[in-house]
From Swiss-Prot:
Keywords, alphabetical: Ribonucleoprotein, Ribosomal protein, RNA-binding, rRNA-binding
HAMAP family: Ribosomal_uS15_B
Known role: One of the primary rRNA binding proteins, it binds directly to 16S rRNA where it helps nucleate assembly of the platform of the 30S subunit by binding and bridging several RNA helices of the 16S rRNA. Forms an intersubunit bridge (bridge B4) with the 23S rRNA of the 50S subunit in the ribosome.
Keyword Coiled coil: no
NCBIfam families per UniProt: S15_bact (TIGR00952)
Keyword rRNA-binding: yes
UniProt name for this protein: Small ribosomal subunit protein uS15
Domain of life: Bacteria
One Gene Ontology cellular component annotation held by this UniProt entry: cytosolic small ribosomal subunit
Gene name per UniProt: rpsO
Positions in coiled-coil regions: none
PROSITE patterns attached to this UniProt entry: RIBOSOMAL_S15
Pfam families named among the record's database cross-references: Ribosomal_S15
Length: 89
């Protein structure tokens, strides 16, 4: 199941650094985290769905790259972000 447009808008408002900010790493990581959570729930009932599992691995990799970027630029911002999202890292 994908994210509804309303949920995506709420995530953008919550994690945006300023109005209209949809491209900051914080917003992108928040949206990816939501999609990863949805796919994780999907796999609890559809264990053999390997095509979607590949998509999940791509999303996790993309999120990790963005988090590494934030960590390299501003470590306190990185720590605050993973704390807010509840990511175990």
């Amino acid at each position: 199941m994908s994210i509804t447009p309303e949920r995506k808008t709420a995530l953008v408002k919550e994690y945006a650094l300023k109005d209209g900010d949809t491209g900051s790493p914080e917003v992108q990581v928040a949206i990816l985290t939501e999609r990863i959570a949805n796919l994780t729930e999907h796999f609890k009932t559809h264990v053999k769905d390997n095509h979607s599992r590949r998509g999940l691995l791509k999303l996790v990799s993309q999120r990790r790259q963005l988090l590494d970027y934030v960590k390299g630029r501003d470590e306190p911002r990185y720590k605050a972000l993973i704390e807010r999202l509840g990511i175990r890292r």
